Amino acid sequence: MRAFARQMTERAKAVAAAGAVAAFWLAVWMLVAALVAQPLILPGPGAVALALLRLICDAGTWAILAGSGARILGGLALAAVCGGVLAGFSSRSRAFAHLVAPALSFVKATPVACVVVLLLIWLGSARVSIAAVFLMALPGVYFSLAEGLTQADQPLEQMFRLHGVRGWRLFCAHTWREVLPFVLSCARAVIGMSWKAGVAAELIGMAVGTVGERIYQAKLLIETADLLAWTVLVVAASWACERVLVWLLRVSGPVAWGAAVRAHGHGLRGRARAAGDGAAAELALAVGDCAPWAPALDGLVLNVPAGGRICVMGASGAGKSTLLALAAGECAPCSMVFQDARLVESASALDNVLVCADARVDASSAAALLRLLVPGVDVHARVAELSGGQRRRVEIARALLCPGGAVILDEPFTGLDAAARDVTADAVLDLFDGRMLLLATHDVADAQVLDISDIITL
């Protein structure tokens, strides 16, 4: 109750502060208008308010505003689609990025008036606003998305791909979540700019039935109050459009993640073996040929029979993680616990497990496994709130419920005490279900609790 009261008090203070600022600038406006004493040059707030009221009460105003808004949003949507496609290609091809970037930088630096005049020559006044908005918004969308894709968490994407999360599910679970902060930043800058570019294009092109045409008419007739009233309407429409679109973008993140979680296991049947359907085929890997950068692995050939258990031991830097990564690439999609933590920090422990789980795994069984491995855990708590040992066991639960013919564990018991390690090892033995099991560790006790006797020492 106190927190609610405090929140309401803070909101009231914010509203009061905003009102005080607005009152100050209205007073400044009234003072300057009184000093100028020329309504044709600078009408006062009262005259502009009357003109604005007259426009609001005219149904034609809303039709004109809606038409201009639709064209502006159409150009913005086209820029978003094309910018996304170009950014996607650029993230996969450095040559393509070098080819596209100069052209978009040139467009970004070109004055709006020059662009509009050229578009009028090429397209005519009817379509000039859509094209102008498209060209003005495209560079901002492209560079923001390209930056977001460049800075995306590559190890986390590797984890998703290895666990069979691909296609639209990978986009919803990872790609969109990674680029969304960049998209939000871009939206705040581009939406307002798009309205300015669109109205400017209508004004220069004198497109019939548009906001730009009405502003031009007000200028010809020296109806300054009407001109300012239309300006207020455009600013309000731009502000409302930005607020709505930014809100929709914010909501899209959790919605996309939820869709990926609900569709767990989608598309994996026929590509990956679910637990209980039989072990993966044997693995024969000439490790030295695959990793020439790792001298410690030179000449090593890894042979693992179907359903076999292998432990790889060695000092830090001996190449254990490299060996397991190569094996995972051969077995993908498979289940893997990486040496470094790879979790979606903003999501719950349960969702982190379910997003990679087999389609036959429901939320109740995933939650039961989490509670077994992490006694007392709130499965709906964000993993960022969990301790290191708890987070480790969330990753182990994810690996055990993920479909695939192999379970690969890289230092899985790091941060666990002996009791937690024993409980976790029992769960691994119960649920790996005859699949190939590869373990990397520096502690022989880890191999013992998992009943692994075949040990490779690097």
Predicted regions and their residues:
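Walker B catalytic motif
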Residues: 382, 411-412
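Hydrophobic anchor residue at the start of the ABC signature
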Residues: 396
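Conserved ABC ATPase signature
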Residues: 382-386, 390
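ABC-family nucleotide-binding domains
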Residues: 410, 417
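Q-loop/switch helix immediately C-terminal to the Walker
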Residues: 340, 346-359
